[in-house]
C-alpha cells in the first residue's frame, strides 16, 4: 500500500473529529472520501498532508511512518478548493513553484511547465496573468502546480467545488482520464456524490469521524451499508421493515425483497426506479403530490392514502401523471435493498 492510516484519531476540544480511522490507498488508485460537512473528511486529508497532527494512530506513506516528517518532505501534492494561486506570479510561475522549492534548474522548470500546461489543456499559457483566467482555467493551473514536483500522492480538497455544474461534469471526466494516463495515486475529498462516483476507483463514505462504508462506486450505489449512507446518496424511499422470507412488512404494505435478504426487523430501501405506477385499482393507492423534472426523467412524489411515508417514483416524461391524480403502486424487487443497521425513520 502506498498510504495507510492506522487508527488515525484527531480530537478538537475533547471531541473526536477523526475517530480511529483505518484506510489504505494502493498505488495508482483514486480514492474519494465522501461525506457531509463535519464528517471528518477534510481533517483526514490534512492529517495525511502533515498539516494536522494526530492525537492517536499513525500515517504510513510508502512504508514509512510519517510521525516526525514535516509536510514539505512527505512527497505529496495538495490542491485546495479555492486553488490558492499566487496573484503576483503568472501561470508559469505558479506551476513552477514546487519545482523551485525542490531546486530544479530553470531549464527543467520551463520544460516541466510546458509539459503540464499541454497536459491540462492550457498550451502556451505560461505568461498569462492569473487574474485573466476563468474558474475552470484556474482549476487546471492549480492541478498542474500540484502535479509539477511529481508527488507520489496527489490530494484534492473539494477540487471542483467552486465551478458551475456543467464545467464540473466536464472536468471530472478530464481528471479521471488524466490520472489514468499518468498513473497518479489520488486521495480526494468531496461532498458531491456525482463527482466522487465519476472520479473514483473506490468511494469511502464518512460519518461523524468514522468510515460508514468503503467500496467501488458500483458496490456502494447498489448496496448502501445502512440508512445513513442510503439517504446521503439521495435515496428517500427508506422505511423500517420486518423481513420474513422474500417479503417485508412495511408502512407501504407487503413489499418483495431479494432472495437471501437478512431476516427480521431492519430497514428497507426502494429505489425510485422500483416504484412502478399502475391503475388506481391496483396495488398501493397514492395521490400524486408533486412532480420534479430531473432532465432524464420526472420524479413523481406520491402520498399513500393511509398516511404512510411518501414515495418517490422515477417516470419517463410522457408517462408521468399530473399532481392530484390517483394511481396504484407496485414494487419491483430488482430495485429493493434490505439495509444494515436499525431504521431511523
From Swiss-Prot:
Cellular localization per UniProt: Cell membrane
Location, primary (coarse class): membrane
Membrane-related topology note: Peripheral membrane protein
E.C. designation(s): 7.2.2.7
Enzyme class: translocase
Keywords associated with the record: ATP-binding, Cell membrane, Ion transport, Iron, Iron transport, Membrane, Nucleotide-binding, Translocase, Transport
Superkingdom of source: Bacteria
CC annotations in GO: ATP-binding cassette (ABC) transporter complex
InterPro entries found in the cross-reference section: AAA+_ATPase, ABC_SmlMolc_Importer, ABC_transporter-like_ATP-bd, ABC_transporter-like_CS, Mo/tungstate-bd_C_term_dom, P-loop_NTPase, Transp-assoc_OB_typ2
Record carries keyword Transcription: no
Annotated positions binding ATP: 35-42
Alphabetized PROSITE patterns for the sequence: ABC_TRANSPORTER_1, ABC_TRANSPORTER_2, FBPC
Gene Ontology MF: a single term: ATP hydrolysis activity
Catalytic reaction annotation: Fe(3+)(out) + ATP + H2O = Fe(3+)(in) + ADP + phosphate + H(+)
Segments forming domain ABC transporter: 3-233
PANTHER family: SPERMIDINE/PUTRESCINE IMPORT ATP-BINDING PROTEIN POTA, SPERMIDINE_PUTRESCINE IMPORT ATP-BINDING PROTEIN POTA
Family: Belongs to the ABC transporter superfamily. Fe(3+) ion importer (TC 3.A.1.10) family.
Subunit-level organization: The complex is composed of two ATP-binding proteins (FbpC), two transmembrane proteins (FbpB) and a solute-binding protein (FbpA).
Function: Part of the ABC transporter complex FbpABC involved in Fe(3+) ions import. Responsible for energy coupling to the transport system.
Name of the protein in its database record: Fe(3+) ions import ATP-binding protein FbpC
Underlying gene: fbpC
Amino acid at each position: 500500500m502506498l498510504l495507510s492510516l492506522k487508527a488515525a484519531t484527531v480530537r478538537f476540544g475533547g471531541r473526536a473529529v477523526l475517530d480511529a480511522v483505518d484506510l489504505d490507498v494502493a498505488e495508482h488508485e483514486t480514492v474519494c472520501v465522501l461525506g457531509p460537512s463535519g464528517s471528518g473528511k477534510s481533517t483526514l486529508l490534512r492529517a495525511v498532508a502533515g498539516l494536522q497532527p494526530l492525537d492517536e494512530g499513525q500515517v504510513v506513506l510508502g512504508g514509512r511512518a510519517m510521525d516526525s516528517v514535516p509536510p514539505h518532505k512527505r512527497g505529496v501534492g495538495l490542491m485546495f478548493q479555492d486553488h490558492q494561486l499566487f496573484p503576483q506570479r503568472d501561470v508559469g510561475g505558479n506551476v513552477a513553484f514546487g519545482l523551485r522549492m525542490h531546486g530544479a534548474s530553470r531549464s527543467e522548470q520551463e520544460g516541466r511547465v510546458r509539459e503540464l500546461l499541454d497536459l491540462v489543456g492550457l498550451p502556451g499559457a505560461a505568461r498569462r496573468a492569473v487574474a485573466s483566467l476563468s474558474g475552470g482555467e484556474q482549476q487546471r493551473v492549480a492541478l498542474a502546480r500540484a502535479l509539477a514536483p511529481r508527488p507520489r500522492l496527489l490530494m484534492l480538497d473539494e477540487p471542483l467545488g467552486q465551478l458551475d455544474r456543467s464545467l464540473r461534469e466536464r472536468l471530472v471526466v478530464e481528471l479521471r482520464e488524466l490520472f489514468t494516463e499518468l498513473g497518479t495515486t489520488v486521495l480526494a475529498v468531496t461532498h458531491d456524490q456525482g463527482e466522487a462516483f465519476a472520479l473514483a476507483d473506490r468511494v469511502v463514505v464518512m460519518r461523524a469521524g468514522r468510515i460508514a462504508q468503503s467500496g467501488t462506486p458500483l458496490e456502494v450505489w447498489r448496496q448502501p451499508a445502512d440508512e445513513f449512507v442510503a439517504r446521503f446518496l439521495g435515496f428517500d424511499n427508506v422505511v423500517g421493515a420486518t423481513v420474513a422470507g422474500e417479503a417485508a412488512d412495511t408502512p407501504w404494505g407487503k413489499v418483495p425483497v431479494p432472495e437471501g435478504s437478512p431476516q427480521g426487523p431492519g430497514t428497507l430501501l426502494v429505489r425510485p426506479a422500483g416504484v412502478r405506477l399502475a391503475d388506481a385499482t391496483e396495488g398501493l393507492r397514492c395521490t400524486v403530490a408533486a412532480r420534479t423534472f430531473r432532465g432524464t426523467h420526472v420524479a413523481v412524489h406520491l402520498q399513500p392514502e393511509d398516511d404512510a411515508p411518501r414515495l418517490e417514483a422515477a417516470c419517463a416524461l410522457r408517462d408521468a401523471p399530473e399532481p392530484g391524480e390517483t394511481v396504484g403502486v407496485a414494487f419491483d424487487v430488482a430495485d429493493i435493498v434490505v439495509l444494515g443497521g436499525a431504521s431511523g425513520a
